[in-house]
Amino acid sequence: MGHTSYAVVDLETTGNQLDYDEIIQIGITFVSNNKISGTYHSMIRTDLDIPPFIQALTSIEDTMLEQAPYFHEIAQEIYKQLKDRVFVAHNVDFDLNFIKKAFQNCNIDFKPKKVLDTLELFKIAYPTDKSYQLSELAEAHDIPLDNAHRADEDATTTALLMIKAFQKFEQLPIDTLKQLYYLSKNLKYDLFNVLFEMVRQHENSPLDNQYGQFEQIIYKKQIDLKAPKTSFNGSLKDLYSEVVKSLNLTYRPQQLYLSEIILEQLMHNDKAMIEAPLGSGKSLAYLLAALMYNIETGRHVMISTNTKLLQNQLLLKDIPSINQALNFKINATLIKSKSEYISLGLISQILKDETTNYEVNILKMQLLTWIIETETGDIQDLNLKGGQKMYFDQKIETYVPVRHDMHYYNYIKRNAHHIQIGITNHAHLIHSDQENSIYQLFDDCIIDEAHRLPDYALNQVTNDLDYSDLKYQLGLIGKNENEKLLKAIDKLEQQRILERLDIAPIDVFGLKMNISEIHDLNERLFNHIFEIIQNSDVYDDDIHRHHYVFEFDSTQILKDLHLIVDKINKTLEIFNGMTHKTIKTLRKQLLYINDTYRNIEQSLKDKHTAYLSIRNLTQKSTIKLIVKDYAVRDILTTRVLDKFNSLTFISGTLTFNHKFDAFKNWFKEDVHFNTYQVPSTLSNHANTNVYIPSDVSSYNFKNIDDYVASIVDYIQEYVTITDSKCLVLFTSYRMMHMVQELLNELPTFEDYVVLTQQQNQNYKIVQQFNNFDKTILLGTSTFFEGFDYQAKGIKCVMIAKLPFMNKYNTKHWLMDSEFDSTFKDYVLPDAVTRFRQGLGRLIRNEDDQGLIVSFDDRLVSSNYKNFFAQTLENYKQKKGDIKQFSKLVNKIQHNIDANK
């Protein structure tokens, strides 16, 4: 690394508006030779008020800056610290622009010669990290960060992560390092200087035996599984007792009972539905049952979970714990569809692609660092999003495998006979059709969080025509001979002429004209769809922020689709008999696009359920046409029920009105299921109150202002007494934002952080909610699925409305043909399940103090109130006005304070 010196900078500011906000803290950590060589830190005085959100985030209050210097008083000192060093920051634009502006105000022209963005660096060095927020990076890489969002600690943490990334790069094989260097020239900042020094100083040594080489790619070799050596002389009860004792867990008869039930289904090839309450230890129960079954019969067991989080918990925590307890080595692995695994030939093609787009360039570098450490080749590890995902998906679709290709899915197939427990998720389980031979090796399956299975099945029964996706796919072909694949074809024809290649002549002009016409026909199709939307009744479910048209005439759409499909077919005829790789790639891309149009055309001809979606009513680019091709019941029957001899469905919420009938309705009628309800380990919810306000009028759209004002009154009463956090759940964004506006206007909430749910930001918001003491989280009904609600005092959830899906929710429309009464058979059970899930996850143990406030009096006064009674029967229920609510909260708070 030579003698390069780095200044790793972190700033805290009063906000993110460069023209208005000011720096309130600076932290600098100096790095030389991969070691921290010093630090600099100062609070900075400002005449601006520090907003409550910034105070909560940074723990910096106005009083802490009273004795601090203004920036101009220490500007020269800071400038001297920075001027001859590489300027480094995490998301460097923010810090660099703020400090440049601060220097500019002091008549100092600060222009660092070299700049490094650790956000860019960490994406390349740590390609599988779920998040590149500093606090999460620190946690993932075991670097202490006690006070996130304090400049001094953040700067040091960033520096330590940077050093770790540098050290990782220095250990890479020289061929990988060189490729990273060449690619880094297309980055925004100066990482290429760092990599150049590493290449220059790299010791040339033979390639380590743990690595292999495919063309120019260095990859980590896979180690085949060994035959399992797991044996146990004793019963399942003995196995359970030994594991519980060894791991110092509580012996729970209900947990053993659950495990015994599951083993019985496996041994007798039965199909069962089991309701086991949250907190009953389901994971350990079914893992031990699967292990015992494998020991006694030698047969594999598939376990399907709802989330990647639970998959990782099973593979990285629960199974290793059992191995430790029994001194075993259980062969358990993740099972997915073939398309979810990488091939080295695909990576090679991506690296050879001349695309210099910034995100694609980052992806190329990520692939190089990932493939040298992955043992599975699981594409999902890369957490691809946005443009990267679109690009990658297109490359998969158009990839023509080379003969000597190495596909990571073959490792799973090769080792399948040694796998004892396969772990998958609901989406892959349902998506896995006949092409996934690996699933056919499993005769027995346990499905956890089974209540979510129909949602995943619903995702598999639709096809869509997406304007933005089709525009992107057609764009990859190009519109003239100077663009994308058309450019490659034109180049091939020039080579044929100049080098006399032994291939048939290509009608480049005719091809270009056809492709141009396909572009125009696509625009015409979506112009017609846009016109239909503008002239139709448009509905909004107020959750997904999309607009929908459910009833429309598809005559013109079918005519347009026919013209496009016909034109693509005629274009494909140009390539008849041609086998060159470039032509194969273009042909495959055209076939992919053609299939998209053709499938929708056939579905509309067959009068399948369909609807139009548009995210922005003024933008054609946000249009989708969605059609339903299969019944959810058929998908669940053929892809789940008929696939396994033994099948066990487990969830904390499988019953509706104390019966399994609603869940049974998802499958064909002639199947017998054994049904079990495991008693809860929490005998009652004595510490939890359900409160129904009597002074809030029943909701209707005419009284929404009064309804919202009542919700805010109760929130205000609660926080005034407890001085603590609160979660408020809504079924519409409109009502949520109305409450937010009122909260922001009231002085009571000046020192509170009001968080509102944003799409794709749930994880981040939950983290903030759990980290802050004085915060209010406003979320939609997606939070009814629950999360790890952390609170020092009362866990309070206020429910604006029960979690019924909006009547304009697309699920409602798609499922209407599958039930005699969509409300009674689908919507109501779904609402009750969501309600039960939310409450069940709120109260996790006997010590939790819970308060649930339901403003929706349908909970106790509607025709279907009895269906919610199953959820509430173990809770204390109270009804009263806001004064009685105040007394109840005071009483609960007094009890908590007395027990401290």
Curated annotation (Swiss-Prot):
Enzyme Commission (EC) number: 3.1.-.-
BP GO terms, sorted: DNA replication proofreading
GO molecular function: 3'-5' exonuclease activity; ATP binding; DNA binding; DNA-directed DNA polymerase activity; helicase activity; hydrolase activity, acting on acid anhydrides, in phosphorus-containing anhydrides
Domain Helicase C-terminal: 713-893
Gene3D superfamilies in UniProt: P-loop containing nucleotide triphosphate hydrolases, Ribonuclease H-like superfamily/Ribonuclease H
Keyword Hydrolase: yes
Enzyme superclass (EC): hydrolase
Domain called Exonuclease: residue spans: 8-161
A GO cellular component entry from the record: cytosol
Amino-acid positions noted as binding ATP in the UniProt annotation, renumbered to this chain: 276-283
InterPro entries from the UniProt entry: ATP-dep_Helicase_C, DinG, DnaQ, Exonuclease_RNaseT/DNA_pol3, Helic_SF1/SF2_ATP-bd_DinG/Rad3, Helicase/UvrB_N, P-loop_NTPase, RNaseH-like_sf
Motif segment (DEAH box): 448-451
Record keywords: ATP-binding, Exonuclease, Hydrolase, Nuclease, Nucleotide-binding
Pfam families reported for this sequence: Helicase_C_2 (PF13307), ResIII (PF04851), RNase_T (PF00929)
Helicase ATP-binding domain span: 241-496
Sequence similarity: Belongs to the helicase family. DinG subfamily. Type 2 sub-subfamily.
Function summary: 3'-5' exonuclease.
Protein name per UniProt: 3'-5' exonuclease DinG
UniProt gene name: dinG
